[in-house]
Regions:
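C-terminal structural segment of proteins
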Residues: 1-286
Length: 286
């Protein structure tokens, strides 16, 4: 099926892009990598008479190392993040998450900003970015603002982005010393399909004890879940009793819904299993 005709607008700056989106309102949509948007338009599930091409704006496809972290431009592709020596050295779990999306052809085109702005509940990167403490930079008619990633997602395919506002980059702070993170994906269908669930965990240890633990899960509910109430783990060893309490805490904070990849009951069971696996994997790394 072919796409209905549309006008491709090519701004040269962020203010120009925002002005184009504001001018055309609901008839316009920002175009990044286009892997999802183009497919939906081909399927006639969506139609926009105007697409604002962000590829013509300089600076949105850069990975910049800053004093306190790494800033990733919205148009950086999944494949570049998967293979980047800087990302693999500083955030191997993040590289793993991006490397498990779809297939190489998709990863060569899809952009990190478009991935997050689409807000599909099955996305791989959000859990990994959440446990790493990422924040996103947004730009609109009122200028720039920064939002913690945990506050960015509002619901299924819904974010805090205002009309004519763009996600322009993602900032990931460097991990403290003696910290590690991991991302695990569980598939029930093909490897190229959406995951049944994804689990990310971040652990900081000192003298054999846990200083901080963060856990996030995706693919279960309309938004990714960053598990709260884990302060009880501080200064504890991750023995079977502590892990059992952790799993109960996770279980209380998730509300899986059924889809083609698993029932509510099955996803809840797999969430416990993969959180346990992720935490044990991190703990054993020292």
């Amino acid at each position: 099926m072919t796409i209905r005709s549309f006008d491709l607008l090519q701004p040269r700056s962020l203010p120009e892009a925002v002005a184009m989106l504001a001018r055309h309102g609901d008839d316009a949509r920002a175009l990044g990598g286009g892997t999802t948007l183009v497919i939906l338009m081909k399927q006639r599930a969506l139609y926009y008479p105007y697409l604002v091409d962000l590829q013509t704006i300089p600076g949105l496809a850069e990975i910049n190392v800053e004093s306190d972290g790494i800033r990733i431009g919205a148009l950086v592709t999944h494949r570049r993040l998967e293979c980047s020596p800087v990302i693999r050295a500083s955030f191997p779990a993040l590289a793993d998450a991006f490397g498990q999306i779809g297939n190489v052809r998709i990863r060569q085109t899809a952009s990190v900003g478009g991935n997050l702005a689409h807000a599909d509940y099955r996305l791989d990167p959000p859990p990994a970015l959440l446990v790493l403490g990422a924040e996103v930079s947004l730009f609109g008619a009122n200028g720039a603002r920064t939002v913690p990633l945990g506050q960015f997602f509002r619901g299924l395919y819904e974010t805090v982005l205002e009309p004519a506002e763009l996600l322009i980059d993602i900032k990931v702070p460097f991990m403290p010393e003696n910290s590690r993170a991991v991302y695990l994906r569980y598939n029930t269908l093909s490897a190229n399909d959406w995951p049944c669930l994804g689990v990310a965990a971040f652990l900081t240890k000192a003298n054999g004890r846990c200083r901080e633990l963060r856990v996030a899960l995706g693919g279960l509910a309309s938004t990714p879940v960053l598990v709260g109430g884990l302060d009880f783990i501080k200064d504890q060893t991750l023995d079977s009793a502590v892990i059992a309490r952790l799993l109960d805490t996770v279980d209380q904070q998730i509300a899986p819904f059924a889809d083609l990849r698993g029932s509510e009951w099955y996803k809840r069971l797999m969430a416990r299993l993969f959180v346990k696996k992720a935490v044990e994997q991190l703990s054993a790394a020292w």
